[in-house]
Regions:
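Stable alpha-helical structural segments in soluble proteins, enriched in small hydrophobic residues
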Residues: 46-50, 85, 103, 190-201
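Residues at secondary-structure transition points
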Residues: 30-38, 69-73, 77, 94, ...
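DPxDG-like acidic metal-binding loop motif
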Residues: 62-95
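N-terminal beta-alpha supersecondary unit
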Residues: 1-64, 142, 187
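Acyltransferase
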Residues: 181-232
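Surface "functional belts" at beta-alpha junctions
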Residues: 22, 89-187, 216, 221-222
């Protein structure tokens, strides 16, 4: 079963092709042009390098958010377009869970993905990796820096951070409350998206292109501004 996965929810753009949960190829870009300019060309190069046609894909997986509003929309629209052509199933994956999956190996640990939500906030969630299993400890949320710091201190153990909010998170927590994470594990990986999607597919958790919905956690700035004007 071939799985195509993509993540464009932050600065990093990543696409991957898997056979079940085995990685065949992954391309990642951490800078340069916008995702609207790079995601489709990256996908074309990925598939061509593996001599695979888009119509051969069985499952389309996407990091559904939270993250950059524009990036989330681009990823969802790309996958919806591909899946709609041949009525293939779609699977949406939490960006934060995919980030945590990057660190789901080795010894038991607490993993906290942090993404820049602006306005003094992170998009974040907490996960435990215990006895070879990644366990979600709370829902995805938008959380102020102050509340984030308070909750991590209350955990009573040092944590591993990942995501584009890594530097800000480490600055808040310092070495007292957090470990250093290798740089290559801090960023989005479409392979992590595919791994989660494969498990969800086996559990019967899938949807159609029409039903796939991004996760924003809060309204885009333009929509918030519009509502404020309406109240006024």
């Amino acid at each position: 079963m071939k799985i195509f996965a993509c993540d464009s929810t932050a600065k990093t753009a990543s696409v991957a092709l898997c056979e079940d949960n085995i990685l065949l190829a992954e391309f990642t870009q951490n800078g340069g042009n916008t995702h609207s300019e790079t995601l489709l060309p990256m996908t074309e190069v990925l598939l061509n390098s593996m001599k695979t046609d888009i119509d051969e894909i069985d499952i389309f997986a996407v990091s559904e958010g939270p993250g950059s509003f524009t990036g989330v929309r681009i990823g969802a629209a790309t996958v919806k377009g591909f899946a709609h052509r041949k009525d293939k199933p779609c699977i949406g994956v939490s960006t934060l869970e995919a980030l945590a999956t990057n660190l789901a190996f080795g010894e038991n640990k607490i993993i906290i993905p942090v993404m820049d939500a602006r306005r003094g906030q992170f998009y974040t969630a907490k996960f435990a990796f215990k006895d070879g299993e990644l366990i979600r400890l709370c829902d995805d949320m938008a959380q102020s820096f102050e509340d984030f710091l308070t909750e991590v201190r209350e955990l009573g153990s040092k944590v591993y951070l990942c995501g584009d909010g890594y530097s800000a998170g480490r600055k808040l927590l310092g070495d007292e409350y957090s470990y250093e994470t290798p740089e290559k594990l801090r960023y989005q990986s479409a392979y992590s998206v595919a791994q989660i999607a494969y498990k969800k597919y086996l559990d019967g958790d899938r949807t159609s292109a029409e039903e796939l919905r991004p996760t924003y956690l809060r309204l885009p700035q333009a929509e918030r501004d519009r509502l404020e004007k309406t109240k006024g």
